[in-house]
Structures are given as C-alpha cells and as structure tokens.
Amino acid sequence: MTSAGEESQNQSHFTYMLLCSDDSIYTGYTTDLARRVQQHNAGQGARYTRGRRPVLLVHWEEYGTRSLAQQREYELKQLSHQEKVDLIARDQNRPAGGVRVPE
C-alpha cells in the first residue's frame, strides 16, 4: 500500500494560466488539468473566474510534486499582466490561441 506522500509523488501536478473573457489572466494549480478547466468554464472553479467565462487555457507547466507546482504558481502570480502575456507568447509548445476545453 502506498502512503499519501508516495501517491502524490507519482501524480502530475500542474500550474496553469487561463485567459478570461475580460482579457485578464488567472493562474492556478491542479492535479487534473482538463477537469479543472471544465470546472472553471462551468462556474464551479475559483470565484475570480465565475464572472469571467468562458476561459481559455493558454499555458500550463507540469511538475512531479505539489510543492514545486505551487511554488511556481506563486512565482507566476507575482508577474505583471504584460510579463504573463510575454511568457504565453514565448511558449512554443502550445497551439496559437491556446486550447479551449469543452464545457
């Protein structure tokens, strides 16, 4: 039987950014990226995104531990809006316009 700590180590942890309908950028953390984006678009995500739907997934980073992902989430939240836009624009691994996850 695996402990909760070991299970967490085998799980992917994501830091992500969403482009909201008002052109603001929301940054969050999750272990299930597709589910979390769907929750945001269904109005069941963070309070911030509820009135700014639909949201578009425009950037994500995958980490092996929760602590690393949450540390990166904090770092991203410290960036200015323009710095976030620049990071998204430099992200060569994402399709242009991001990925819209169906509601």
Regions found by a protein language model. Name each.
Residues 1-56, 60-62, 67-82, 88-103:
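GIY-YIG nuclease catalytic motif and its immediate N-terminal context
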